[in-house]
Structures are given as C-alpha cells and as structure tokens.
Amino acid sequence: MKKHHEKKPKKIRAISINKILSSAQDEFILQGYKGATVQAIADNAGMPKANVLYYFKNKENIYHAVLEQTLNMWDEGIGDILPEDGPKLAIEKFVKAKITMSFTYPKTSKIYALEIIQGAQHLQGLTRTYLNTWVQEKAKIFQCWIDNSQMQPVDPVNLIFLIWSSTQHYADFDNQILTIMNRDDYKEDDITHVTNFLTDFILRGCGLKQ
C-alpha cells in the first residue's frame, strides 16, 4: 500500500508539469520569451498561477524546461549520419527523420527556431559546443565520401544546412504552407510525399540518383 501511495504524488506531479510545459510551448510560440507571462501560461493550463510557481520558480525556469524538453526531442529525432551507411542511405535516413520530426512535433521546431532568431541567448553553450561538434563530425563523413568518389563534390556543411532548413520549413511555416494549399492541417500521406520529394531532389544534387 505504501508504494502505491508513493507513486500517486509522482504521477500527479508529472501530469501537472506536462500540462504546464504544453501550455508554455503555446505561449512562447505566440508571444515569444519576452511577451509570455506566467499568468497566461497558468490560465492556458487551467491551473492557478501559484501551482505553476510551485513547480517552476519563475518564467525563466519554465522556458529553460521547455527548451530542454525541445532539445531532447530534437536530439532523439534528428537521426544520424553513419559512415557505414554510405551517402545514399545516410541522406535518406536523415531526411526521413527530420521530416517525421517536423510533421509530428511542429511546436518543438518552432520553439527552437524562435530561440535562434532571438539571438540564442539561452542556447549559446549548446550552439557553440554540441551543435558545432555534431555538424563538423558529420561534414567530415560527407567529405570522406566525396574524397572516395562516392558522391558529387558539394559543400558538406551547407548540405547539412539545406537538409535542416528544407525539412524544418514544414513545421516553422506550417500556417503559410497550409494556407497556400487551402488546408486546415497536414494529411497522413504528406510525410511520405514530402520525404520522397526532398530525398529525390537532394540525392540528385549529390549525384546519387540515376
């Protein structure tokens, strides 16, 4: 019985935190960090402001928690570029992972994009260390394939930027895309269609499509 009672508060805490972070995502996307307020986050979550501040002492802590959640999801969904895959399979996997992430978790992409646009003040350590290291490591893999004549000579870093920007566009600018397409939301087969289109386009540019 004791273990059952111990689990209940933890479950309630987890549910409350998820509600707060979900509400905070919407608020930060709509208002940005400066315009967002703890009161608005609490109202959107259907909770008293005091309850929000019980779990997070201030707006900055909430924002950092949202960013941490965002980066964890982004890191898990980014896919990887492995030497043993070869350039064609690596690009196919990378594009698919990024498109799936953008369509499944558009808010995650928007939060990250807004933080970067606003100067990345809360992410400076990450962009200068982890992301820089990741890009340089993957660029070396592409360069190795280029040197071994496994793909056309392209700028590896800009190739990564191209894949990032083209895939994340469907999340960051979903309102614009859906308006042009005269739709309320994406359809199930959009992920497959966009993945195939971008993969084919990028592979051709890298000399990997006959």
Question: Predicted regions span which residues?
Answer:
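C-terminal peripheral helix-coil segments that are non-catalytic and often amphipathic
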Residues: 1-4, 100, 104, 132, ...
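N-terminal intrinsically disordered/low-complexity leader segments
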Residues: 1-15, 22, 210
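Hydrophobic/aromatic residues within well-ordered alpha-helical segments
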Residues: 16, 59, 66, 70, ...
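Helix-turn-helix
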Residues: 19, 23, 27-61, 65
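Amphipathic alpha-helical linker/stalk segments
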Residues: 66-93, 138-144
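Hydrophobic alpha-helical connector segments
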Residues: 79-108, 148, 156-163, 192
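Amphipathic alpha-helical segments used for helix-helix packing
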Residues: 103-125, 174-182
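Short acidic/histidine-centered micro-motifs embedded in hydrophobic/aromatic stretches
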Residues: 111-115, 129, 162, 166
